């Protein structure tokens, strides 16, 4: 965890982590700090408790988030990568706004699958003061996210809502008249429980910690079933999201989703063509050894997108 040259220029996590500052912000991190083979301070990223405390320190030191915790066995997100998605999405909005990232409570974002960690709303509000609606099918995850929001006094900035129909993503979620500048989604990656387990085992092995007698750790490759896999995997989930987005075409400026598997792009592009998207963007992202990309689509042409921003400014 030394140099991270591929991070977005506005990402707060460039270069080495400042462990003295992190420990000052959250002293509990000191008991998890080790010296890596290069003689630099680090943590054991195979220790889920260490990762959770590290995230808590990072959020407090870098973002002013005073209280953050998640239940055991829920995804513990790598924050630099999550922040990159926020910044890349912000640039997407800036492209139609004379190069300026729109900030403030007039900008509304929808996080599909907000999770127990509530990470995208926390980062997006901290960096750009956007307001968020976070949705999830899991009531335990929503209860955790709600506790984080309330503990940090963010109830006016971050609203949480359960998607009551597990077969739907967007359908039936939005209320009459709700409009969003942006949607975010980090979809389930795997197509089955077995595939998800194999993926966790690969990451476990890559950390050099493979031990058949030891339970797989939870950290950022743990997670509940609905966080890790869905029937049909990433391609089916994103294609369904594209299909459901049509009914909200006029109420959302840009829909976006992360796509981990490049091999899924042709199928997603075909779904977007079928849906009649007027603008499509595929933006590569990379953090360390992990490559991903943001797929974005809009049902508004260039003139309509400019008008959207102008209308929002007039209401500010």
From Swiss-Prot:
Gene3D superfamilies named among the record's database cross-references: Vaccinia Virus protein VP39
UniProt keyword Cell wall biogenesis/degradation present: no
GO cellular component annotations of the record: cytoplasm
Subcellular location(s) of the protein: Cytoplasm
SUPFAM superfamilies xref list: S-adenosyl-L-methionine-dependent methyltransferases (SSF53335)
GO biological process: rRNA base methylation
Known EC number: 2.1.1.181
Main location: cytoplasm
Name of a matching Pfam family: Methyltransf_10
Transmembrane intervals: none
Catalysis performed (reactions): adenosine(1618) in 23S rRNA + S-adenosyl-L-methionine = N(6)-methyladenosine(1618) in 23S rRNA + S-adenosyl-L-homocysteine + H(+)
Task performed by this protein: Specifically methylates the adenine in position 1618 of 23S rRNA.
Name assigned to this protein: Ribosomal RNA large subunit methyltransferase F
Classification lineage: Bacteria, Pseudomonadati, Pseudomonadota, Gammaproteobacteria, Pseudomonadales
């Amino acid at each position: 965890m030394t140099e991270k040259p591929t991070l977005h220029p506005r990402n707060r996590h460039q270069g080495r982590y400042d462990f003295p500052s992190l420990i000052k912000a959250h002293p509990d991190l000191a008991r998890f700090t080790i010296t890596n083979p290069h003689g630099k301070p680090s943590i054991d990223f195979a220790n889920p408790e260490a990762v959770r405390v590290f995230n808590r320190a990072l959020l407090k030191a870098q973002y002013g988030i005073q209280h953050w915790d998640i239940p055991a066995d829920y995804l513990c997100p790598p924050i630099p990568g999550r922040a990159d998605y926020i910044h890349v999405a912000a640039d997407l909005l800036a492209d139609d706004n004379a190069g300026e990232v729109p900030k403030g409570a007039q900008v509304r974002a929808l996080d599909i699958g907000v999770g127990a960690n509530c990470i995208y709303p926390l980062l997006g509000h901290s960096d750009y003061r956007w307001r968020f609606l976070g949705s999830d099918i899991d009531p335990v995850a929503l209860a955790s996210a709600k506790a984080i929001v309330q503990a940090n006094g963010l109830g006016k900035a971050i609203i949480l809502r359960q998607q009551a129909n597990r077969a739907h993503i967007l359908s039936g979620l939005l209320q009459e008249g709700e409009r969003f500048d942006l949607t975010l989604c980090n979809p389930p990656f795997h197509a089955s429980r077995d595939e998800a387990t194999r993926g966790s085992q690969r990451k476990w092995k890559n950390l050099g910690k493979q031990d058949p007698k030891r339970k797989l750790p939870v950290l950022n490759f743990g997670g509940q079933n609905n966080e890790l896999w869905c029937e049909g995997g990433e391609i089916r989930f994103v294609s369904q999201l594209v299909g459901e987005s049509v009914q909200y075409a006029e109420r959302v400026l840009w829909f976006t989703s992360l796509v981990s598997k490049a091999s899924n792009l042709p199928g997603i592009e075909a779904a977007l063509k079928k849906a009649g998207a007027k603008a499509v963007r595929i933006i590569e992202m990379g953090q360390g050894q992990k490559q991903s990309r943001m797929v974005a689509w809009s049902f508004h042409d260039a003139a309509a997108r400019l008008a959207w921003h102008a209308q929002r400014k007039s209401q500010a």
